[in-house]
Curated annotation (Swiss-Prot):
Residues 1-18 form the signal peptide. Residues 27-315 form the GH16 domain. The active site is at 167 (nucleophile), 172 (proton donor). This is Beta-agarase. CDD domains: GH16_beta_agarase. Gut bacteria supply the human body with energy from dietary polysaccharides through glycosidases that are absent in the human genome. Beta-agarases, which are active on agarose from marine red algae of the genus Porphyra, are present in marine bacteria. They are absent from metagenome data of gut bacteria, except from the genome of the gut bacterium B.plebeius isolated from Japanese individuals. Coiled coil: none annotated. It comes from Phocaeicola plebeius (strain DSM 17135 / JCM 12973 / CCUG 54634 / M2) (Bacteroides plebeius). Its EC number is 3.2.1.81.
Length: 316
C-alpha cells in the first residue's frame, strides 16, 4: 500500500513539474493570445498535454517525447469507422509537424460498410490515429493549428469520453473537391455528439451554423488555420477560427435536448484524439478516396503544426 501511494505521489509530482516547466518555456503559439475570455479573477494556464511537435517520431519507433503525451492509436481497440483501418505506422512527427497519412495496399481487406439503410463491401483505407495520455475537462480551451488533407477523407481533432458517450468536435472537415453535396473544403464541422450506446442513439446539432463557412470563400485545405473550442461548462461551447469567435451554443435545448445525459450536459473527462477517417456515410456514397487519388501521398496527409490546451486558474 505504501509503495502504491509513493508511486501515485511521484507521478503527481512529475506532472506538476512538467506543467511548471511547460509554462516557463516559449512556444510558437505564444504570438496568439487565447481568444476566449478567462473571466474575472481567472487566467489561462498552459496544460502539459500541449504539443508543438518539434521533435522526431518515426512511423515504426516514435520515441520517448511522443509517447510521453500520446498513444499512436484510438483510445480503445476499435479500428475506425469502416472502411477506415487505423494503423500505428501511418502516424509520424517530422519537420515540426504531426503527420497522419492514408494508403490502400493491394492486399488490404474488404470491410463491410453500413450507413443507415445502405450496406456495401469496400476495400479498407489505412490511416492513423493518436490519443492523448491525459484527459481534459471543462473549463478548458483546446486549439489546433492544422492543414486539412486534400482528400475526401475527414481530417479530425476532437475530444471523446472514455465510454464513448460524450464528444466535442474541434476540427472535422473534408479537404477534397468531391464534396458530395455541401460538405466541401469551404466548411468546418463545429459540433458535438451525445450518445446512448444501448440501444444506440446519437444526438448532434443540425443547425446550419454547425457547418461553418466564412464570407471569404476560404478553402481550409489551402493553408494552416487555428481552430479551437472553449468548453466553458456542461452547457456552453464556444468555437474559434483563427482567433475569431464564430459559433456559440449554450443551453440544454441545443446541447442535450433529448436528455441523453440525464440533465448533466457535457460533464465527463475526455481524451483528445487526432486522426483521419474514411467515414462510412461518405464511403457508401462513393466518396472513399480512389486508389489513384491515394497515390498522391501529400494530398492524403493531415498536418498538425501544434495543439495547445489551457485550463483556468485563479489569478495570483
Amino acid at each position: 500500500m505504501k509503495r502504491k501511494l509513493f508511486t501515485i505521489c511521484l507521478a503527481s509530482l512529475q506532472f506538476a513539474c512538467a506543467a511548471e516547466n511547460l509554462n516557463n518555456k516559449s512556444y510558437e503559439w505564444d504570438i496568439y493570445p487565447v481568444p476566449a475570455n478567462a473571466g474575472d479573477g481567472m487566467v489561462w494556464k498552459l496544460h502539459p498535454q500541449s504539443d508543438d511537435f518539434n521533435y522526431i517520431a518515426d512511423e515504426k519507433d516514435k520515441g520517448k517525447e511522443f509517447y510521453a503525451k500520446w498513444t499512436d492509436f484510438y483510445h480503445n481497440h476499435w479500428t475506425g469507422p469502416a472502411p477506415t483501418i487505423w494503423q500505428r505506422d501511418h502516424v509520424s512527427v517530422s519537420d515540426g509537424f504531426l503527420k497522419i497519412r492514408a494508403s490502400r495496399p493491394e492486399d488490404v481487406p474488404l470491410k463491410k460498410v453500413v450507413s443507415g439503410p445502405n450496406t456495401k463491401e469496400l476495400p479498407g483505407t489505412y490511416t492513423g490515429c493518436i490519443t492523448s495520455k491525459t484527459r481534459v475537462k471543462y473549463p478548458v480551451y483546446v486549439e489546433a493549428y492544422a492543414k486539412l488533407s486534400n482528400s475526401t477523407m475527414a481530417s479530425d481533432v476532437w475530444m471523446l469520453s472514455p465510454d464513448d458517450t460524450q464528444e466535442i468536435d474541434i476540427i472535422e472537415a473534408y479537404g477534397g473537391d468531391r464534396d458530395g453535396g455541401g460538405y466541401g473544403a469551404d466548411r468546418l464541422h463545429l459540433s458535438h455528439h451525445i450518445f446512448i450506446r444501448q440501444p444506440f442513439k446519437d444526438y448532434q446539432p443540425k443547425d446550419s451554423g454547425s457547418w461553418y463557412k466564412d464570407d471569404k470563400g476560404t478553402l481550409w485545405r489551402d493553408d494552416f488555420h487555428r481552430v479551437g473550442v472553449f468548453w466553458k461548462d456542461p452547457f456552453t461551447l464556444e468555437y474559434y477560427v483563427d482567433g475569431e469567435l464564430v459559433r456559440t451554443i449554450s443551453g440544454k435545448d441545443i446541447i442535450d435536448p433529448n436528455n441523453y445525459t440525464g440533465g448533466t450536459g457535457l460533464v465527463k473527462d475526455m481524451d483528445i484524439i487526432i486522426n483521419m477517417e474514411d467515414q462510412s456515410w461518405r464511403a457508401v456514397k462513393g466518396l472513399s478516396p480512389t486508389d489513384e487519388e491515394l497515390k498522391n501521398v501529400e494530398d492524403h496527409t493531415f498536418l498538425v503544426d501544434w495543439i495547445r490546451v489551457y485550463t483556468l486558474v485563479p489569478e495570483e
